[in-house]
Amino acid sequence: MAQRDADKYLYVDKNIINNPLTQADWAAKKLVWVPSEKSGFEAASLKEEVGDEAIVELAENGKKVKVNKDDIQKMNPPKFSKVEDMAELTCLNEASVLHNLKERYYSGLIYTYSGLFCVVINPYKNLPIYSEEIVEMYKGKKRHEMPPHIYAITDTAYRSMMQDREDQSILCTGESGAGKTENTKKVIQYLAHVASSHKSKKDQGELERQLLQANPILEAFGNAKTVKNDNSSRFGKFIRINFDVNGYIVGANIETYLLEKSRAIRQAKEERTFHIFYYLLSGAGEHLKTDLLLEPYNKYRFLSNGHVTIPGQQDKDMFQETMEAMRIMGIPDEEQIGLLKVISGVLQLGNIVFKKERNTDQASMPDNTAAQKVSHLLGINVTDFTRGILTPRIKVGRDYVQKAQTKEQADFAIEALAKATYEQMFRWLVMRINKALDKTKRQGASFIGILDIAGFEIFELNSFEQLCINYTNEKLQQLFNHTMFILEQEEYQNEGIEWNFIDFGLDLQPCIDLIEKPAGPPGILALLDEECWFPKATDKSFVEKVVQEQGTHPKFQKPKQLKDKADFCIIHYAGKVDYKADEWLMKNMDPLNDNIATLLHQSSDKFVSELWKDVDRIVGLDQVAGMSETALPGAFKTRKGMFRTVGQLYKEQLAKLMATLRNTNPNFVRCIIPNHEKKAGKLDPHLVLDQLRCNGVLEGIRICRQGFPNRVVFQEFRQRYEILTPNAIPKGFMDGKQACVLMIKALELDSNLYRIGQSKVFFRAGVLAHLEEERDLKITDVIIGFQACCRGYLARKAFAKRQQQLTAMKVLQRNCAAYLKLRNWQWWRLFTKVKPLLQVSRQEEEMMAKEEELIKVKEKQLAAENRLSEMETFQAQLMAEKMQLQEQLQAEAELCAEAEEIRARLTAKKQELEEICHDLEARVEEEEERCQHLQAEKKKMQQNIQELEEQLEEEESARQKLQLEKVTTEAKLKKLEEDVIVLEDQNLKLAKEKKLLEDRMSEFTTNLTEEEEKSKSLAKLKNKHEAMITDLEERLRREEKQRQELEKTRRKLEGDSSDLHDQIAELQAQIAELKIQLSKKEEELQAALARVEEEAAQKNMALKKIRELESQITELQEDLESERASRNKAEKQKRDLGEELEALKTELEDTLDSTAAQQELRSKREQEVTVLKKTLEDEAKTHEAQIQEMRQKHSQAIEELAEQLEQTKRVKANLEKAKQALESERAELSNEVKVLLQGKGDAEHKRKKVDAQLQELQVKFTEGERVKTELAERVNKLQVELDNVTGLLNQSDSKSIKLAKDFSALESQLQDTQELLQEETRLKLSFSTKLKQTEDEKNALKEQLEEEEEAKRNLEKQISVLQQQAVEARKKMDDGLGCLEIAEEAKKKLQKDLESLTQRYEEKIAAYDKLEKTKTRLQQELDDIAVDLDHQRQTVSNLEKKQKKFDQLLAEEKNISAKYAEERDRAEAEAREKETKALSLARALEEAIEQKAELERVNKQFRTEMEDLMSSKDDVGKSVHELEKAKRALEQQVEEMKTQLEELEDELQATEDAKLRLEVNQQAMKAQFDRDLLGRDEQNEEKRKQLIRQVREMEVELEDERKQRSIAVAARKKLELDLKDLESHIDTANKNRDEAIKHVRKLQAQMKDYMRELEDTRTSREEILAQAKENEKKLKSMEAEMIQLQEELAAAERAKRQAQQERDELADEIANSSGKGALAMEEKRRLEARIAQLEEELEEEQGNTEIINDRLKKANLQIDQMNADLNAERSNAQKNENARQQMERQNKELKLKLQEMESAVKSKYKATITALEAKIVQLEEQLDMETKERQAASKQVRRAEKKLKDILLQVDDERRNAEQFKDQADKANMRLKQLKRQLEEAEEEAQRANVRRKLQRELDDATETADAMNREVSSLKSKLRRGDLPFVVTRRLVRKGTGECSDEEVDGKAEAGDAKATE
C-alpha cells in the first residue's frame, strides 16, 4: 500500500496523457498560450490572424481576445504533458515550462529534470517518497530508468565519483523557504544508506548515524522561524563527505558561513530566535530548570515576540531529539550541560537593565540579579563583570584608564557580548561535530560536497546580513551560469566542434564587482572597510561615499519607493533589493568589550574558558576608539596584529568555497518556492516565472537540447562500447579517435546525434542512455549463452559418468553371476588348486629374469643418482644466481626508493624556493610600483611648482597691469579682481589635485590589495603543485605495485631461467650502468644541495636588502610628508599674497597717487618670490638626489635578485634534466619488462589455444554422443505417438495456411507502410528544401536587419550629435543672443524639430523592438523545427533499423527452416537405416528359429536312438565299437549344435539390445518431434505477434508522422505568413529609414545654418570683446560692425530659408523626374526670380536696421555689465572653441558651403548658380545611390534565381529518391515471391510427412514381428532354465559362460565402433 502511495508521487499516469481525445482536441483547435495577468499564461485556440495581431478564443470562458502575434507562444502536444525532462519538449518557451511544472506540482510530482539539472518545488507537506524502499529503488539505477528525484541526482554524483574519481558537489540553491535544507538532509540520508560499510539494513555504522544526527544539532542551534520559512537556515554550511577507494564513507567535515548572530538578541515581528532557546524552555525538566535558572518566555527581553509556535512541531519533543543526537555524536553530559548553561546565560544577559544617573551621562545598574545569574552560569565574578561593563579599562597611549560608560554604550556592550557568546558556542559545536566525524583513520580518496546556504532574501528593508547572503547567492548563480553556459561552450570550441557561441546575457559580474571590487572604483564592502578606519565616520557618511563612488553603476540605484527609509538599492539577479545601512560599521567591525572577554577566558567553568580561548583575535573597544585620526584610507590593509573586518573574513571564506566548488563537478538542484503563504497545492505563476528567469532554466534547457551534454573520452568509449561492435575495429594497434569513428559507423548513429572532438566523443542528450541499454542487453545475451554452454557441459559430463557407472554395474553383475555358477563346480575347484602348483616351476625362471632386471635397475639408479647430483648442483647454482639477482633487485629498489626520497625532498625544496622567489618577485614588484608612485608624485610636485611659478609670473604681470592701468579706468581694477578670481580657481584646482593625489594613494592601497589577491593566486598555484606532488606519489605507488608484479612474474619465470640467462646478463650490465648513473646523480644532487644552501644564504642577504629598502621607503615617506608640509607652507604664503593683493586693491581705491609705496611693496614681493624659488629649487635638488640614490640602491637590489633567480633557474633546470634521465631509464626498464611479459603472455596464449582446441574436441565428442542418444529417443517417440503427430500435422497445416494468410496481409500492410514511408520521406525532403529556403530567407532577413540596425545606429549617432549640437547651440544662443527674438524663434523651431525627431526615434525604437521580438520568436521556432527535424530523422533511422531487423528475422527464419529440413532428412535417413537393420535382424531371427527347430528335431532323434540303445542293452557287447563311433559323431554334432545355440543366443541378445535401442530412439524422436512442432508453433505465434506489433507500431508511427506532417505544414504556413509579415515590416522599415535619412539631411542642413549663426555670434562676441578692451571712442566703429553683423545674420537667415525651400523643391522635382534637364533649367530661372525677391527683402531689412540701431544704443548701456560677464564667458568661449574645433574637423564641407553662401550674398547671382550646381551634384549622387540600390536589388534577384536553381536540383533529387523507393518496392516484391516459394516448400514438407506416416506403419509391422521373435526367444530361455537340453550341451554352455565378460566387452566395443561409424 505504501509503495502504491509512493508511486503516485513519482510516476506519471500514462493513460491520461495518451488519451486520443485530447490529442484530437489539441490538433483541431490549434491551441496556443496567451499571456494572462492571473495565471501567467492561458490556453486559447487560434481563430484568425490580422496583420501583427491575432484573434484567439480563450479556452476557459470562450471570450475572443485580440493579441499581438509576438506574445503568442506555441503549445506542446498532450503527449508531452507532465514530461519528466523539460528538454524533451518540442516547443520550448516560458509558457510550456510553467505549464509542465504546474501540472506536475498539482499531481504531487515535485521533482522535474531541466536538462542537466533538477528543479524542485516546495510541496509544503510531507510526501511518502523518502523511505528506505525508495532508496533501494534508486540505488545503482541510471537517470533515465527512474523518475526524477533528489536520490537520482545523488546517485549519479556518487556513481560518477566512483567511476571518474572526480570530486563532486551538490548545490541546492534558491530563495529562502524553497526547500534547500530538506533536500540537503535527503542527500545525506541517501549517501549514508548507499555508502555505508555496514551493508545490513538493521545494523548501521556509527559514523553514518553520527552523520545523520549532525543535521538536527545544527538545525537546533542555527535555524529559526522567519516570515517566509518555518525552518530557515540562518547560516550557510558546506558538508564535505569523504569516501575511500571502495566508495565507503570514511569521514565528514562541515564548514559554516555567516551565522546571523543578531537574531539571538532581537527578532522581527512573527519571527523566532534560534530553535534551541524554545527547545530548552519547553523541554527542560524541573531539576534542569532550577540548575539553569530558567524562567518563562515572557521574562526574557531577548525573546522579542514571546513564545511563537511552529505548526506541526512540538518544541518539547525536539529538545529530546536534539539531546539524543548530541549523545549519538559522542558529546559527553558535562559538555551538554555547559552548552545549556551558555544558552541560559545568553538569555539572562538580555535581562540586565542599565539606567542613566541624574547628574551625569554615566550608566548604572540598579538591580544586579540578572548579572548574578549570568556570572553564576558562566563561572565569573559578579563585581568584575559589572565593573568590566560599567567602567572598563581602555588603553590610552601606553597607559590603561578606567572609562565610565553611558547607558547606550553599556547596552551595546551587553548585546555584543550575547552575540559573541552565542557565536563562540556555535563555532565550538561545529568543531566538536567535525572532530566526531573525522575520527576514522582510513584515508579519503574523494569527496562529495553538499552546499546548503541561506537563500536569496528580499525583505522590505534589508541589512548587512542580507547583503552578505545575497552576495553569496550572486556568486553561486554566476558559478552556475559559468559552468552551464560559458565552460560548456568553451569546451566545444577547445575540442574543435562546429559551434556558434551563444551569449545568453546572464553575466552577473557587474553586480558582484559592485559589492566586492577592491578599487577602481571600490565596491561596497571595500568602502565599508575603508570607513571603519575613520574615527568620525558614520553610517550616513558611508552611504554618501557609496553614492559618490557607485552612483553611476548600472546595478546601483537610489530607492524610489522607500526614499525616507532605505539608503540605496542594488539590482540583484533575483530583483531589486533596498538596503538600510543602520549600524553597518559596527556590524562590520564587530567590536567587543575585551575586559569581559578576558574575564570569560579566566572563567572557573572549563567549558566557558574553552569557548573564549581565542581572546587575542577579538577586536576590543579601545582598538575601535583609538584609531588615529591621521589614518588615511589607503592605510587600510590587513596585517598581522590588525583586526580583520567581518566583510573581509566572509569574502575570504567565500573565495575558498568558490575555489573548492570550481575544483569539483557541480550537480545543481534549483529549489523553487511556489507561494509566500506557505500553503500546500498553491502555485503563484508569476513568482515561479520570475525564479525560472533568474535561475536561467530556459537557457539551461536550450543549451542541453542544442548542445552535447554527454561526453566520453576515446579510450573509455572504446573500452565500454566495443562489445556492441565486435568486428568493427581491426586487430592490432589503432588510434583512439579512428577506433571511435569506426565504432560509431558500425553503430549506425545519426550524424546529428554526436560530434567527435580532439580527445572526446560528444553526444546529444539521451544517446548514451540508449547505448547503455543496448550494452546491457548484449551483456545479458552473452551471459545467457555462457550459462547455457556451462549447463550443457555439466549435463554431458554427468551423463557420461552415469553411462560408465551403468556399464561397470553390468560387468560386475555378469562376473558375479558367473562366479556363483562356477564356485560349486569340482573342476573349478581342481583348477584353483592346481593352478598355483603350475607356477612353481616358472618361479626359478622368473627369479633369474628378476635378478637381471634388478641389475639393470641398479645401473639405471646409479645413472639417475648421477643425474640427480648434477641437477642438484645446477639447481644450487641457479639458486645462488637467484639470490644474487634478488639482492641486486633489492639494492636497486632501495636505490630507487632513496632516489625517490631525494627527489621528493628536492621537489619540496624546489617548491619552497619557488615560493620564496614568488614572494621576492612580488616584493620587487611592490617596490617598483612604489618607486613608480614616488616618481609620479615627484613629477606632480614639479608640475605644481611650475604651476606656482607660472601663477607667480601671472601675478607679477597682473601687478604690472594694475600699476599701468590704475590711473586710466576702473574697468581695469575690475579686471584685476577677475584675475584674483582666476587665481582662486587655480587654488581650487590645486585642492582638486590634492584630492587626486589622495585618490591615487587609495589606488595604491587597492594595488596592495590586488597584490594580496596575487598572493592568494600563488597559494592556489601552490595547491596545484601539491596536487601534482600527490599525482607523482600516486605514480610512485603504481610503480611500486608494478615492481611487485614484476617480482611475481620473475618468480613464475624461474622455471624458464635457463632460456633467460643472456637477458639477465644484459640486465646486470644495465644495472651496473644504472649504479654508475645513480652515483653521478647523487653527486649532482649533493652539488645541487650545496647550491640550494648558497641560494638560502643569498636569500637571507636579499631579505636584509629588502629590509633596508623598506627602511629607505619609510625615509622617503617621511620626505614626502616634509614636502607636503613645505607645500602647505607655500600655499599659506600664496594665501598671504592673495590677502596682500586684496589690501593693495583697497589701497589703490583709496589712494591713486601713492606709486612709490606700491613700487617698494612690489620689490619686497619680488625678493620674497626669489627666496621662495630658491628654497623650492633646493628642495627639488635634494629630492632628486635622494630619488637617484634610491634608484641606484633599488637597481642594485634588483640585479642581485635577478642573479639569484637565474641561479635558482639553473639549479631547477639541472634537477629537471636529472629527473628526465631517471624517468627515461625507468621507461627503458619498464619496456624490457613489458617485452618479457609479452613473451610469457604469448606462451600462455598458445597454451590456452591448445586447451581451447582440446575442449572443443571434447565438446564435439560429447555433442556427438548427445546427438546419438537424442536420435534414439526420437525413434522411440516416433513409434509411440505417430497418431498424435498426424493430428498435429493437420493442425500445423491449418496453422500454416492461416499464417500464410496473415503473412500475405502483413506483406500488404508492409507495402502500405513502405508507400507511406516513401510519402513521408518525400514530404521530409520537401520540408528540408523549404527549411533551407526559410533559412536562406532568414539569413537575408538577418542581413537586412543588420543593415537596419547599422542604419539605426548611424541615425542614433547622428541624432545624438545633432542633439549635442542643438544643446550647444541653445547654450550659445541663450548666452550670446538672449535679447534677440530671432534666437527665440530658432530655439522654438529646434525644440519642435527635436520633438519630432524624438517621436520618430521612439517610433523607430518601437519598430526595432517589434522586429527584435519577431526575430527571437522566429529563432525559437526555427530551433523547435530543427529539434523536430532531428526527431524525424531519428524516427526514420529507427524505422530503417526495424526494417533491417525484420529482414534479419526473415533470414533467420529461412536458416531455421533449412536447419529443420536438414535435421528431418537426417532423421529420415537414420530411420531408413534402422528399418533395414530391423529387417536384417528379423531375417536372422527367423533363421535362428529354423535352426532351433532343426536342433529340437535332432534332439528328438537322439532321444529315440538312446531309448533304442537302452532297449538294446543286452546287445552292448556286440556293437560297442559301433556305439563309440556313433557317440563320437553325436558328441561332435552336440558341440556343433551348442556353438550354434550360443551364437543364436548372442544374436538374440543383440536383437533385444537393438530393439531396446530402437524403442528408446523412437521415443526420443517422437518427443523431439513434438518439441520441434510446439517450438515451431510458438515461434510462428511469436512471429505473428511480433509482426502484428510491428504493424501496430508502424501504424502509430505513421499516425505520428501524419500529425507531425500536419504540424510541419501548419508551421510552414505560419512561417510563410511570418515571412510575409517580415517582408512588409522590412518594407515599412525601409520606408521609415528613407524618411529618417531625409529628415536627417534636413536636420544636417538646419545644423549647418545653426553653425553659421554660431559662427556669426562667435565673431560678434570676439568683436565685442575687442571693442570692450579698446576705449569708448571705438564704440561707433563697433556699432557699425554690429550693424554689419546683424545684416549678415539676417542675410544668412534668409539664405537658410531660401536654401531649405530650394532643397525641398529640388528634392520633390527630382523625385518626380530625375532625367529631365530642361526642368532643371526652368527651376534655375525660377530660383533666380526668387533671389531677386530675396534682394527686395534685404532692402526691407535694411529699413529695419534703424530699429536695430536703437536696440544697439540700449545694448551700449548694457556693455558695462557685459564686460563683467565677459570674463566668465571666456572659459565658456574656450570650451566652445574646443567644440568648434571638433565641429570644424567634422564639418569642413559645411564651412566651404558657408563661404559659398557668404560669397553668394556678396556676389549675388554667380554664387547662387554655383550653389545650385553643387546641389544638383548632390542630387546626382543620390541618383547614383539609388542606382546602386537597384544593382543590389538585381543582385538579390540573382540570388533568388540561384535559389530557384537549387530548388530545381532538389526536385531532381526527390525524383531520384522516388525512383530509389520504387526499386525498394520491387525488392520487396521479390522478397514476397521468395516467401511464396518458402510456402510451397512447406507444402512439400507436409507431403513428406505423409510419406513418413507410411514408414511409421511399416515400422509398426516390424515391431510386431520383433515382439513375436521376443516371445520365441523367451520360450527358448524358459526351456533352457527347465533343463530340457542334454547335459553335454549345458556343460558347453557353462564353459562358454567363462568368456562371456570378454565377449560382452568386445560387443560393447563393437557397438561403440558402430556408433562412431554412424557418427
UniProtKB/Swiss-Prot annotation:
Domain annotation IQ: ranges: 779-808
Record Gene3D superfamilies: 1.10.10.820, 1.20.5.340, 1.20.58.530, 3.30.70.1590, 6.10.250.2420, Kinesin motor domain, Myosin S1 fragment, N-terminal, Myosin VI head, motor domain, U50 subdomain
GO molecular function: actin filament binding; ATP binding; calmodulin binding; integrin binding; microfilament motor activity; protein homodimerization activity; protein-membrane adaptor activity
Residue positions binding ATP: 174-181
Keywords assigned: Actin-binding, ATP-binding, Calmodulin-binding, Cell shape, Coiled coil, Cytoplasm, Cytoplasmic vesicle, Cytoskeleton, Motor protein, Myosin, Nucleotide-binding
Tissues where the protein occurs: Expressed in fibroblasts, brain, lung, kidney, spleen, and skeletal, cardiac and smooth muscles.
InterPro entries, alphabetized: IQ_motif_EF-hand-BS, Kinesin_motor_dom_sf, Myosin_head_motor_dom-like, Myosin_N, Myosin_S1_N, Myosin_tail, P-loop_NTPase
Primary location recorded for the protein, binned into one broad class: cytoplasm
Segments for region (Disordered): 1118-1168, 1694-1717, 1879-1917, 1936-1959
Record field: compositional bias (Basic and acidic residues): 1122-1148, 1694-1704, 1947-1959
Coiled coil stretches, renumbered: 837-1925
Function summary: Cellular myosin that appears to play a role in cytokinesis, cell shape, and specialized functions such as secretion and capping.
Subunit structure: Myosin is a hexameric protein that consists of 2 heavy chain subunits (MHC), 2 alkali light chain subunits (MLC) and 2 regulatory light chain subunits (MLC-2).
Protein name (Swiss-Prot/TrEMBL): Myosin-9
